[in-house]
């Protein structure tokens, strides 16, 4: 991987529910299907996905030759359990990730030689890169730690961009609890306020505010009662760097409470 493979962008994608794979009425599905045409036309050497649906005590990376498709959901249409996204893995990239994290002071970086791709990874990737011909590695989140930890993970991984690796955080701009009632009339005010705060903070480059969102963001406890769907954003943000420019590249809603806000970060 040489300098000609340089990638300036990292991304955060709100992946929603697994239904995005089959529900043509979802604007987020059309957005991801148009990925190469409208958002990112370059074919990366490999893809690193940080998914909300892999939580571990220490940073962990999967080391496999071929990625299995994990059906980590229940009660959905049978068709969803028939999809296969058998993208190759990349043990070489996994080793590089370990080295970068260790070199940045992360004392324990684990490997998982059995794990494939959960729906936070394969559902969007199936829409973005349906050929499944690009090697994919997945990195876990540590939901018991904070945004700054995940931002530093991203900072450590930034050299991968110069090696042709596309870094994608996959979570959700808002991810309320299952018991949160949907809004029957537009977007719930609490969700709109958080979503607007996030867009303003990111596009203004106020990344430290986003790292410390628990003291800065309105209604954060409603938007993210658990943080695992937010932390992939921090990794993408950290990998882009503090002087990068953030841009909202998609926004739509489920039930007026779940935001599909998705962002591109471009390094200067």
From Swiss-Prot:
Protein name as catalogued: 4,5-DOPA dioxygenase extradiol
Similarity comment: family membership: Belongs to the DODA-type extradiol aromatic ring-opening dioxygenase family.
Gene: DODA
Gene Ontology biological process terms in this record: pigment biosynthetic process
Free-text function comment from the UniProt entry: Opens the cyclic ring of dihydroxy-phenylalanine (DOPA) between carbons 4 and 5, thus producing an unstable seco-DOPA that rearranges nonenzymatically to betalamic acid. Produces mainly (S)-betalamic acid.
EC number: 1.13.11.29
Misc: Supplementation with Fe(2+) in the reaction medium is not necessary to detect activity in contrast to the results found for the M.jalapa enzyme (AC B6F0W8).
Cofactor note as given: Binds 1 zinc ion per subunit.
The keyword Electron transport appears for this protein: no
An example Gene Ontology CC term for this record: cytoplasm
Residues that hold Zn(2+) according to the record: 15, 53, 175, 229
InterPro entries (UniProt xref): Extradiol_dOase_DODA, Xdiol_dOase_suB
Subunit (UniProt): Monomer.
């Amino acid at each position: 991987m040489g300098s000609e493979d340089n990638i300036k962008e990292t991304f955060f994608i709100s992946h929603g529910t697994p239904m995005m794979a089959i529900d043509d009425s979802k604007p987020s599905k059309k957005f991801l299907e148009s990925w190469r045409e409208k958002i990112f036309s370059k074919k990366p050497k490999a893809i690193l996905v940080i998914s909300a649906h892999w939580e571990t005590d220490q940073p962990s990376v999967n080391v496999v030759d071929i990625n299995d498709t994990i059906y980590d959901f229940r009660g959905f249409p049978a068709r969803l359990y028939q999809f296969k996204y058998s993208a190759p893995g990349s043990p070489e990239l996994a080793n590089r990730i370990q080295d970068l994290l260790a070199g940045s002071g992360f004392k324990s970086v684990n490997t998982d030689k059995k794990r494939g791709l959960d729906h936070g990874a394969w559902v969007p990737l199936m829409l973005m890169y349906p050929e499944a011909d690009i090697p994919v590695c997945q990195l876990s989140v540590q939901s018991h730690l904070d945004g700054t930890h995940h931002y530093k993970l991203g900072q450590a991984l930034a050299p991968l961009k110069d090696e042709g690796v596309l870094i994608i955080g996959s979570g959700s701009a808002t991810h309320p609890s299952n018991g949160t009632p949907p809004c029957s009339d537009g977007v719930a005010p609490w969700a709109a306020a958080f979503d607007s705060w996030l867009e303003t903070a990111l596009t203004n480059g106020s990344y430290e505010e986003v790292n410390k969102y628990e003291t800065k963001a309105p209604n954060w406890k409603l938007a993210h009662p658990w943080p695992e769907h937010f932390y992939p954003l921090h990794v993408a943000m950290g990998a882009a760097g503090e002087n990068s420019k953030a841009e909202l590249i998609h926004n739509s809603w489920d039930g007026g409470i779940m935001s599909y806000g998705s962002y591109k970060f471009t390094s200067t």
